Structures are given as structure tokens and as C-alpha cells.
Amino acid sequence: DDPLRVVRLVRLAAQLALEPDAETIALARATAPAAARVAQERVFAELKRIVAGDGVIASLALMDEIGLTESVLPELHALHGVEQNRYHHADVHTHTIEVLAQAIALQADPGAVFGAEHAAAIDALLAEPLADEVDRGFALRLGALLHDVAKPATLGRRGDGSPTFLGHDRAGAELARDVLTRLKASEKLKAHVAALTRHHLRLGFLVHETPLTRRALYRYLKASEPVEVDVTLLSVADRLATRGHKAQEAIAKHLDVAREVMPAALQWRAQGRRPPLVRGGELAAALELHNGPELGRLLGEIDEARFAGDVTTPEEAVAFAARLLEGD
């Protein structure tokens, strides 16, 4: 007997639009704990097909029903019953499934949020092969499932008893990496999903910096690359699935910022890294500096100023760096 069959049951039920009968469900429940002992690369091969499938939401519900989630994705199972603050309408697990549903809807029709003029570029990006025989669209779904995975571990309480999850983005990036390491995923997929988890809150922070400056936009893109487009999509899905106190106002503001960020993110990704206005050695010679953190900081400041349109030539870049040094 191969316990992997219970994972295949979930996949085939969705693929063939079948509803397992009571006897099959009972047998699956009895077998599900043994799935934890199956070679993880075999489990992941089936999970990839489940997550990529059209019926993934129903598949995840079936996995919960038969106890399979607890065996093969215990971190997802642990989200059940973890309450959130008043800005959420559901516990962490229900919210996570709704984020996945919103991500799937965005994947199917990005133009509904970002306009027809950007839909083709987003479609093309999500269709790009990534690693482990999956594309970026699959990775977005996986990121949706794992974006809040560290909330149980980071749960705290304010004085009034309301829950907090400070640092769940950073801790979640490590936990997402651990999950995918256990499943024998490639380093590239692990890094991609960890980055989605790590940066999924960034766009929400930008809402408090409106109207956006070019410098604020630069810092967002620089911090979140190479998932600057993907994580913008994930952030929108996350916001749309958060429907608690003052939700409509918050969603509207979030979408306004996302619509401003997305064209810049697409352009940033399409253009790639531009040759610097001035190289480190040239700047060091001009300002009589040694290689080190200070030189790196100045080069970063020049790059940000260039994005903002404040410097456009090598000479302006050197003069700008000199002014920064004088200010220090």
C-alpha cells in the first residue's frame, strides 16, 4: 500500500470533478497520517498539481476534511482558529484561503484591477517558467498559501487583548523556506516564495506615504526585486481578502497605490539593471574614498536620486555624492 494514494485522491477528485463517497472519505482519513512518511519529493509532485489546478480551493477543503493537510502541510493546518484583529473578518486559515482565491482571480483577469493596458504584461510575467517545472503564477498561489504562515508563532497581545503578529513577514519568509526545503523544492523556488512572504506587507506601508514620491517608489522596487510585480499582486489579493473594520476605504486606498506601483514595477523589471552613472572605483577616486560601506551607501543614494530624476549625468552624480558627504 502506498499512502501517496490519498494525495492522488485529492488531485484526481478535482481533475475529474469527482466527489468521494463516505467509504472513500473514511479510508482516506485512516490513510492520511501515513502520508507524512512518504518521500517528500513525491508528495510535492502531487501538491504542485493540486495547487496549480482549477479546483485548488475545493482540493484544500478536501485535504482538511480527511486530515491530509495536517500530515503534509502542518504549517497550513496550524492556521485554523488563529484569531485576528478587527480589521480582519476571519481567522488566519480562512483568510489565507480567501487570499488564494483572490490571487487566482487576479491571475485569471489582472486587467480587472490594473486595467487592460497592463494585463498582457502581467499575463506574460505569470506564465514565465520559474523552477521545478512550475511558473510564476504557480509561485504566486504558493505565496498566497504561505504568506501568513508565521502568524501562529508570532502571536502576541496588546493591552486590550487584541492579537498582534509583529515580524510575521520576516519569520514567515524563513518558515516558508523551511516548508519548501522539506518538500525538496529547488533553491530558486524557495527564494522566490520566501521573498513573496517577506515583502507582502510593503505595499500596505506605501499607502501611508501617499502621494508617492519617486524615491518612495524606488525604495519599494529595490527592496522587493526580483518579485516586485508578483508581490504587488499578492498584496492586492491580501487586501481584497481583508474585510473587517473600515475595509472598503482601506481597499480603495490600497488599490490606488497598487495601480500607481504596477506600471513602474513592470517597467523596472522589463528594463533590468541600467549601467551606473558612476562606478564605485570612479566615485572613490573622485572623492578620495576607500572601498567599504560608505562607498556602497553613496552609490545607492546616487541610484535612488537617478530614479527620482535628481541626477542624470556622471558629473551630477559625483557632485551629489560630495554634497552628501559634506552633509554627514
Model-derived segments and their meaning:
Residues 69, 92, 227-229, 271:
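A generic structural signal for short, non-catalytic loop/turn and secondary-structure boundary residues
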Residues 162-164, 216, 253-254:
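Short, low-complexity, polar/charged sequence segments that are solvent-exposed and flexible
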Residues 42-43, 123, 177, 214-217, ...:
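Short amphipathic alpha-helical surface micro-motifs
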Residues 103, 107-111, 144, 148-153, ...:
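Alpha-helix capping/termination and helix-coil
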Residues 1-137, 141, 145, 149-167, ...:
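Glycine- and charge-enriched loop/helix tracts that form the active or gating conduit
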Residues 60, 70-72, 106, 202, ...:
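FIC/Doc superfamily catalytic core
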Residues 82-88, 114-136, 185-249:
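Histidine/acidic-rich helix-loop-helix segments that form or flank divalent-metal centers
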Residues 203-210, 243-328:
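Terminal helices and disordered tails flanking the catalytic cores of nucleotide-processing hydrolases
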